[in-house]
Amino acid sequence: MGIIKFLKNVGKEMKKVTWPKGKELTRYTITVITTVIFFAIFFALIDSGITQLIRLIVE
């Protein structure tokens, strides 16, 4: 299968995709950003706690 045929098939499949509308896209975007921020803060706190624990053990 050549690259041209592959790209044509990709184009056909992309036409079948149902893309989200404005409000739905905004809701999904806010959900993703909120989730990323939550997990970033969560893992930063966990990392900080483990760092402090290791410092207590080492010293």
Curated annotation (Swiss-Prot):
UniProt xrefs under PROSITE patterns: SECE_SEC61G
This protein's encoding gene: secE
GO cellular component, one term: plasma membrane
Membrane topology note: Single-pass membrane protein
Residues annotated as transmembrane: 30-50
Physiological role: Essential subunit of the Sec protein translocation channel SecYEG. Clamps together the 2 halves of SecY. May contact the channel plug during translocation.
Main location, first listed in the record: membrane
InterPro entries in alphabetical order: SecE_bac, SecE_sf, Translocase_SecE/Sec61-g
Name this protein carries in UniProt: Protein translocase subunit SecE
Localization of this protein: Cell membrane
Biological-process GO terms, alphabetical: intracellular protein transmembrane transport; protein secretion; protein targeting; protein transport by the Sec complex
Family statement drawn from the similarity comment of this UniProt entry: Belongs to the SecE/SEC61-gamma family.
Assembly and oligomerization: Component of the Sec protein translocase complex. Heterotrimer consisting of SecY, SecE and SecG subunits. The heterotrimers can form oligomers, although 1 heterotrimer is thought to be able to translocate proteins. Interacts with the ribosome. Interacts with SecDF, and other proteins may be involved. Interacts with SecA.
One GO MF term: protein transmembrane transporter activity
Keywords: Cell membrane, Membrane, Protein transport, Translocation, Transmembrane, Transmembrane helix, Transport
Domain of life, per lineage: Bacteria
Keyword Protein transport: yes
